[in-house]
């Protein structure tokens, strides 16, 4: 059977943490159906260019939520919600093992973005990127 993946709009003040909550009140704006797609929990539009050219702003990424940061596969691409001084920062990055205990290294595909080490405890939500969809024309 063809999987029906909910597509959410998290532009503006919306954040990932409620989207990942078990009883989320966020309504999908649409549904995506792709043959042979691995199991996904949802999809969102990409904003920003940290993973450009692999994924660019406006692309759709499909994700599978992780309940525990320790389940990360080092080197894979993730959608992350990070606590930055009380504000939520949403990003798509490769997650690599850090040399520092209790930290992870966030790596961009885009060479104009520097790698960043963050404390694991600052990660509010994390999801593995399973697929992406790129539109070449709109309309």
Provide a role label for each language-model segment.
Residues 1-57, 67-71, 135-139:
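Short, positionally conserved secondary-structure boundary motifs
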Residues 9, 94-97, 131:
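A residue-level detector for short acidic-glycine micro-motifs
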Residues 12, 85, 111-112:
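Short acidic/polar capping segments at secondary-structure boundaries
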Residues 21-26, 61, 95, 109-111, ...:
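Short intrinsically disordered coil segments
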Residues 36-101, 105-107:
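Hydrophobic protein-protein interaction segments
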Residues 100-103, 108-139:
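Amphipathic alpha-helical interface segments
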């Amino acid at each position: 059977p063809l999987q029906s993946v909910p597509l959410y709009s998290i532009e503006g003040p919306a954040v990932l943490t409620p989207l990942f909550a078990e009883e989320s009140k966020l309504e999908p704006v649409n549904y995506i159906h792709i043959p042979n797609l691995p199991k996904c929990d949802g999809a969102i539009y990409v904003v920003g260019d940290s993973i450009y050219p692999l994924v660019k702003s406006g692309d759709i990424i499909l994700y599978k939520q992780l309940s525990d940061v320790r389940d990360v596969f080092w080197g894979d691409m993730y959608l992350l919600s990070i606590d930055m001084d009380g504000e939520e920062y949403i990003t798509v990055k490769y997650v690599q093992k850090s040399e520092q205990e209790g930290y992870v290294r966030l790596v961009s595909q885009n060479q104009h973005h520097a790698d960043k080490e963050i404390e694991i405890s600052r990660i509010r939500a994390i999801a593995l990127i399973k697929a992406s969809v790129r539109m070449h024309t709109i309309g």
